[in-house]
From Swiss-Prot:
GO terms for cellular component: cytosol; mitochondrion. Its cofactor is Fe(2+); L-ascorbate. The keyword Oxidoreductase applies. Fe cation binds at H202, D204, H347. The modification Phosphoserine is found at S351. This is Gamma-butyrobetaine dioxygenase. Gene3D superfamilies: 3.30.2020.30, Clavaminate synthase-like. Keywords: Carnitine biosynthesis, Cytoplasm, Dioxygenase, Iron, Metal-binding, Oxidoreductase, Phosphoprotein, Zinc. Pfam families: GBBH-like_N, TauD. It comes from Mus musculus (Mouse). Binds 1 Fe(2+) ion per subunit. Belongs to the gamma-BBH/TMLD family.
Length: 387
């Protein structure tokens, strides 16, 4: 963004700065915000990209004492003779207009979301390419953010491969099941995933108040019959539920549900949480689905008259997930790694037969969306700027 200032002046009793840009646009900036974001070395630690100015020292009613400008900068003197300079590009990017704010939020958080159903074309990349090439790693994470799932092929059929992916993004998310965990048939299993039975659509770990955002599953060994993976775009199904039955959507997006997980693995644990199954932001958009029927608690903290309507709403939601129109079924091969948005996708598994030896083995891990988004922003900068 290359911007040129045509005119800048203090207005509204010097409580605002107005800029007229060469492209014909206009911007207003509050004086208190400008003073708060002074970029001088006394107010801003450039080595940490962090504000040094203490809020206690900020006059929230401050006025601009003097203002000059050229095409590339604005120069402000404040009542206590403090001096600030602001670059045109920096100011234009932070314009308070609705359009400019939406554009910047889009750059920061990459909200684009591509809904899908059974017609999904599963994004696929090579495992080694993602590890060794920034362009491929950027495609991986940007597709993960937009579509919600990416398959990587060509990993070795041994444990430890997803640890490499963890290092590629930064680090993995430690839970009570360890840094990584083995999905295979186990005697006295401490999780229903460690059996051969069918797993219905679920998100992982709603028993935590902050469930892991991204899941990684690496296929090391696959059974000949059964064990197919099933996924569904939870955001898409939520939208369809809202269209079909607004009351059911309202119940699931307003009722807190108890989840629990108790056992011993990485250490002993006793976890309790409360979530709305459909979690909305302040604009009413779905931002997370929290649902695991296995760990939904027997405790249900609602008045008795709300119990049956809740079950009816939940049953309709689950029936929609299982309809052929929305679910996508595939079978992982040894060396495949699927990485997916655990806040958006629900996943399941078809049953398979137990044998005398382990016939199906996946290694799993989690990552936090903050870590993934951090790496995605860094990769975008490298790929788009060529450095």
């Amino acid at each position: 963004m290359h911007c040129a200032i045509l005119k800048a002046e203090a207005v509204d009793g010097a409580h605002l700065m107005q800029i007229f840009w060469h492209d014909g646009a206009e911007s207003l900036y509050p004086a208190v915000w400008l003073r708060d974001n002074c970029q001088c070395s006394d107010c801003y630690l450039h080595s940490a990209k962090a504000r040094k100015l203490l809020l206690e020292a900020l006059d929230v009613n401050i006025r601009i004492d003097d203002l000059t400008f050229d095409r590339k900068k604005v120069y402000i003197t404040w009542p206590n003779d403090h001096y600030s300079e602001f670059e045109a590009n920096w100011l234009k990017k932070r314009c308070f207009s609705q359009q400019a704010r939406a554009r910047l939020q889009g750059e920061l958080f990459l909200p684009e979301c591509q809904y899908w159903g059974s017609e999904l074309q599963l994004p696929t990349l090579n495992f080694e390419d993602v590890l060794n090439d920034d362009d491929h790693a950027y495609k991986w994470l940007s597709s993960l953010k937009k579509v919600g799932i990416v398959r990587l092929t060509g990993a070795a059929d041994k444990r430890g491969e997803i640890i490499k992916l963890g290092k590629r993004i930064g680090f993995l998310y430690l839970t009570f099941y360890g840094h990584t965990w083995q999905v295979q048939d186990k005697i006295d299993a401490n999780n229903v995933a460690y059996t051969t039975g069918k797993l219905s659509f679920h998100t992982d770990y709603p028993a935590l108040h902050h469930p892991p955002g991204v899941q990684l599953l690496h296929c090391i060994k696959q059974t000949v019959t059964g064990g197919d993976s099933e996924i569904v775009d939870g955001f898409n199904v939520c939208q369809k539920l809202k269209e079909k039955n607004p009351q059911a959507f309202h119940i699931l997006s307003s009722t807190f549900v108890d989840f629990t997980d108790i056992g011993v693995d990485y250490c002993d644990f006793s976890v309790q949480s409360k979530h709305k199954i459909i979690e909305l932001d302040d604009k009413g958009q779905v931002v997370r689905v929290n649902f695991n029927n296995a760990t939904r608690d027997t405790v249900f903290d609602v008045p008795i008259e709300r119990v049956q309507p809740f079950y009816a709403a939940l049953k309709e939601f689950v029936d929609l997930m299982n309809s052929k129109e929305y679910k996508y079924t595939f079978k992982m091969n040894p060396g495949d790694v699927i990485t997916f948005d655990n806040w958006r996708l629900l996943h399941g598994r078809r049953s398979y037969e137990a044998g005398t030896e382990i016939s199906r083995h996946l290694e799993g891990a989690y990552a936090d969306w903050d870590v993934v988004m951090s790496r995605l922003r860094i990769l975008r900068q490298r790929v788009t700027n060529g450095n």
